Regions:
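Rossmann-like dinucleotide-binding domain for NAD(H)/NADP(H)
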Residues: 21, 35, 41-127
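Rossmann-like dinucleotide/phosphate-binding beta-alpha-beta segment
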Residues: 1-34
Length: 127
């Protein structure tokens, strides 16, 4: 919690696991600075959208930028849609849609194929 209390920006880049579901909820938001900006490009379920929308509505945090949501595509009924504006940026799961990201994916794929063909372990192997 000390890290959350001190953070000016909280950028989430974690996998969705049992431990990360709802990681940022009422309790976490309550200890953050009123100026903190939360960025979520991980998985929608990591953030409790109702808790985040309430914190934004009440001005308890400075802002948020989300590229992932619990339900995708985001619908008009999502609580974050009601607070979208100057301090809230919502994008349609497109954070990886840059030329740099696409080139990195291609490069890593080719490197992994070569590694497997040569009997080596692929890069970033998930087991």
């Amino acid at each position: 919690m000390d890290l959350l209390k001190a953070a000016d920006v909280l950028s989430l880049h974690c996998p969705l696991t049992n431990e990360t579901v709802g990681l940022i909820g009422h309790e976490a938001l309550a200890v953050m600075k009123p100026t903190v900006v939360i960025i979520n490009v991980a998985r929608g379920e990591v953030v409790d959208e109702d808790a985040l929308a309430l914190a934004l509505k009440e001005g308890r945090i400075g802002g948020a930028s989300l590229d992932v949501f619990i339900g995708e595509p985001i619908t008009p009924g999502n609580p974050l849609m009601a607070v979208a504006g100057d301090k809230v940026v919502l994008t349609p799961h497109m954070a990886g849609a840059t030329m740099e990201s696409q080139m990195r994916i291609i490069t890593m794929t080719v490197e992994n194929l070569a590694a497997v063909i040569e009997g080596r372990e692929p890069i970033n192997l998930v087991t």
